Amino acid sequence: MTSPSVHSLTTPQIKNWHRSNISIFILLGMGFTAMATRMPLVKADLGVTASQLGLILLATGLGSLGGLNLVGWLIARWGTRLWILWMFPVFTLDVILGAVFVENHFTLGYVFTYVLSGFVMGMVDVANNVDGTALEKATNRILMPRMHAGYSIGTLIAAGWGALSSAIHLSLTLMLLPIVLAQLALPFMVHR
């Protein structure tokens, strides 16, 4: 990810950097969309009304505001790579914890996971965008649209998987397992 020596990178290193950035966007899209496909189940398991569920979903925005206010300072101090590699596992574990809370009818715990998810996802998203901007500068090419398309690919994958999981009545935890495994592989994908 970003470092003072980006201009001395080889072509294979630049390509790996680009693939890593796209992979992160794909996994962000998957992690964010996976639970959205199962909101009717979430609503039923938590025993909340539609308006109460709407209020729960606001928690993501509240968490995001906190993360977005910190991430600039953190990136300036430690760079993008550290925050992506540290925060992504937190995001991944938070997603699975949210499913466990839903399956155990623990509404307050689920709200907490949504606050944390917003906080962490906002930080990873900004760090990955800053990293993508550095890649564009290093290559003198416009690459960000392709990187952001990765997020859309991730949402499509997760939406399809979520719909299939719902049709075959997979639990939330089992539905999230392949996504979590893909996200936990992230440190092995993020390299130059």
Identify the residue ranges that each predicted region occupies.
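Pair of pore-lining "gating" transmembrane helices in MFS-fold secondary transporters
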Residues: 10-44, 115-116
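Hydrophobic core of transmembrane alpha-helices in multi-pass small-molecule transporters
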Residues: 26, 94, 105-124
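Short hydrophobic/small-residue motifs within alpha-helical transmembrane segments
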Residues: 61-62, 152-154
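Helix-to-loop junctions at the C-terminal end of transmembrane segments
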Residues: 67-80, 166
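Primarily marks hydrophobic transmembrane alpha-helices of the MFS/SLC 12-helix fold
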Residues: 81-88
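C-terminal ends and interior cores of transmembrane alpha-helices
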Residues: 89-104
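Cytoplasmic helix-loop-helix junction between adjacent transmembrane helices
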Residues: 113-150
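Symmetry-related core transmembrane helices of the 12-TM Major Facilitator Superfamily/SLC fold
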Residues: 173-191
